[in-house]
């Protein structure tokens, strides 16, 4: 655990010492600068759970106070909704701590839809029933409408990586675009 939070997530990715007040202040001010200079709408924070929890929580609090309509998406690569919900702002699961992170990434949806694409929904817990069963845990999220859903990203294989099945992609995209999530 300390290797993840106090050093190196992987050997090619050294951490910045966010416990150092000068480093922390630089990161906050740098975020403000990019928001103002480039007029960006949001930040996707990679490997969110592996940074210093208190520093990240305070960073999010400062960003939310300075820019209330601004959003940060935290990559929380866990495939169970209870673990993902723990990281969302105002989660009762993490109380009394608060990450202040408005949007978490729904790796459960990604995982289930990518398994379901090769299965028929003819028995319980197979096919699209897997996706449904991940949605039943929405009550764990303080704000399920602010969860980011996706069928692939830059860290994963392409959804159609195993062949061209346009109807399957259309069905997955329809589900992605109509579910109670940020697509």
Predicted regions and their residues:
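Alpha-helical scaffold elements lining the catalytic groove of polysaccharide deacetylases
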Residues: 18-30
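Short helix/strand-capping turn motifs
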Residues: 182-183
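Active-site-proximal helices and loops of the catalytic beta/alpha 8
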Residues: 30-32, 36-143, 147, 164-166, ...
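Ligand-binding/active-site lining segments
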Residues: 150
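Aromatic- and acidic-residue-enriched carbohydrate-binding clefts of CAZyme catalytic domains
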Residues: 1-17
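Surface-exposed cleft-lining segments at the edges of enzyme active sites
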Residues: 157-161
